[in-house]
């Protein structure tokens, strides 16, 4: 709407004006000549080359002042080159600077100027739609215009995020996903009903009033009232269990589990942010990645990465401002944008976006609290995504050759093993090994090493690494002593510095396998990506060039090892924190435990069951039922 309004107020005062003197061919003289025609109006300017290709689009609160800046010295090499290529300029005046900002971003997307930040991936995002034009509303994925009798929830970052959420919502609320035509022509329940994904409204398996209650609960969940709904379902489940309505209790338990899985899949779940996009930026060596998390109704509906075209001398503020302007040119704007970096025209951008959204839009760069943590997560994702993109830009073979060159190997390695440990003050300690080969990560070769209490001194990182490598090579020597089965590494990468490398070298010497090359990978003094130091036994530390693709490749392997190790550690820690009393009963293994929980809904319900109810469970003998009953009676 703002763009159409602006078109009525613009004046083109380009070089074709008959009273304007003929400017020199290119460069500073061209720009100097145009200054004579400009006033202090706000507007947008375009710089064009001798073939009328647009080099740059900019906006200004004062066109004359802004353009005059180009005639002064002190520009970067990129700007100097752009000026030298400029042979013509065009100007469009606007009534306000806000209009100029909106027009600038629109023209950049249309014209794709060579010297502007350019968002190349301009995709739309899907929503969840609950139809309202039917007695039994449908739940489905939706793209495109949001109109008609329906409720829309989103946006979601990807179709996958929508599909996963829909899958769990159908388990929880049993809402139909069939078309109206299919609904009207059903004579018996479909497969969705059989697998408990639909309540069967098409054949009268549920009343319209009860179905409407399920729709209401689904909408409440999507609108951010998930905790309240889960509390209500939990109370219903408890009441059903106490009334010995075990089938209903089990169904309610499954609904709670499905809703919990929706939340756990969301990763970050902010408590104090109801509607916002969290935008994190990472710039490195002339490349950029922007990560956007979509927060709606206090829920994280996924994240998406973008790779705008940038130049190496562009600042984070410049890239962030350009991204925001272009990204929201054709998308709904949330009530709040939470940014990792300040932008120069934050107030102006907020006004422009507020006009577009027809409500207040706030732009914030948090300095502390939960929002700071959310932004840090977005930046971390952006950094990791950029690292993956850079490492994938070269072929795997080329990267492996680069590894060989960097570390003085005789040939590119076919198998690289990367090791990392994870623990909290020595508790639940684990080691992780990931493997990289000619075709990428070899996930079927990953291994985890549980470090038992007493095996090493708590918190002794060197001792943990020695324990892991001792186990690894003891097994290799036993299973493949002749190194003929492709199980032996061509290179070891150790997460750590000189101390870890020395510890590993001791183990290698003890096992007589000193011929296997090893390198320690340690972050630099300020622990920044790009400043890693590398250690080999008995040698001084060395580094690689920050823009070397091999460095990104190593970072990617090191980060994957860290992810694998810390994930294993968290699983081990979670298991130790959540002890199920059924695990301690003699004769109750995984199969019978599952049967008991399925039948009663929870371990607490099992503990309250009488003997006859326990005997009724499939797979539980009379003797085992008595054992279970007696176990809980004496507790």
Curated annotation (Swiss-Prot):
Residues 1-27 are annotated as: Disordered. GO terms for molecular function: DNA binding; excinuclease ABC activity. It comes from the Bacteria. One of its GO terms (cellular component) is cytoplasm. Its main location: cytoplasm. InterPro entries: DisA/LigA_HHH, GIY-YIG_endonuc, GIY-YIG_endonuc_sf, GIY-YIG_UvrC_Cho, RuvA_2-like, UVR_dom, UVR_dom_sf, UvrABC_protein_C. Residues 1-14 have a biased composition (Polar residues). CDD domains: GIY-YIG_UvrC_Cho. Transmembrane segments: none annotated. It holds the Pfam family UVR. It is found in: Cytoplasm. Residues 40-117 form the GIY-YIG domain. GO terms for biological process: nucleotide-excision repair; SOS response. Residues 227-262 form the UVR domain. Keywords: Cytoplasm, DNA damage, DNA excision, DNA repair, Excision nuclease, SOS response. The UvrABC repair system catalyzes the recognition and processing of DNA lesions. UvrC both incises the 5' and 3' sides of the lesion. The N-terminal half is responsible for the 3' incision and the C-terminal half is responsible for the 5' incision. Belongs to the UvrC family. This is UvrABC system protein C. The lineage of its organism: Bacteria, Pseudomonadati, Pseudomonadota, Alphaproteobacteria, Rhodobacterales.
